[in-house]
């Protein structure tokens, strides 16, 4: 997709962070917007940022873990705009817990949003993207979809799942030659609210970690501004890239994993232990 003018983009998690910046930058390029988020106040803030651009915008309060709600939203988008060209499955949450301490409730919570939300969004919009004749799906994984880390088993699992799902989807779309493509995004630490909304289990104390300190450390890792991330994503869509790594941290982690696919886990354990002793 060479340009976004007069295209229609559906974005989940559009009330803050990367989703909000995608909306702003697409509006600047003349893209009509179907924005959704579970946070209505955040959506209102995003609308305030894009309202002066000559594009149509709809706002929908949406829980991406609700399949019917996502399907209804996709239908409404097609009815409102007559077409959908871009889908950004961006909504996500974080969770820190040991495997032993991970509750089934928390595991289902994070999978329902991070993985099933992506599946629902992809499947609900795919027929409309094909109808448009020129479509693109962008699914947000993570650098934790490239490597695993202690206390991140559930989060890792969801992001590895998004990666596998999207890479398989891209191959199928290539074989179909249907005019629709897909990109998997692996952001490093992006300066968003994900750390503040993350669930922190006391079980990580068994590894010598303090939940409050872990949350502060997580926040310090968030270096890349969301507008920079959004720019990289849109550039990747225009170039039809299969995968995009965002941030120096994601690029370094990816390189280390390629060089030593199993050895990196020992290094990660060492670094985690070193941090907890500080």
Show where each model-derived region lies:
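Conserved glycine-rich Rossmann-like NAD(P)H-binding loop of the short-chain dehydrogenase/reductase
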Residues: 29-45
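Active-site helix of classical SDR
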Residues: 122, 158
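Residue(s) in the substrate-gating loop at a strand-loop-helix junction
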Residues: 142
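The beta1-alpha1 cofactor-binding region of Rossmann-like NAD(H)/NADP(H)-dependent oxidoreductases
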Residues: 40-41, 61-72, 104
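Conserved glycine-rich cofactor-binding loop
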Residues: 8, 15-17
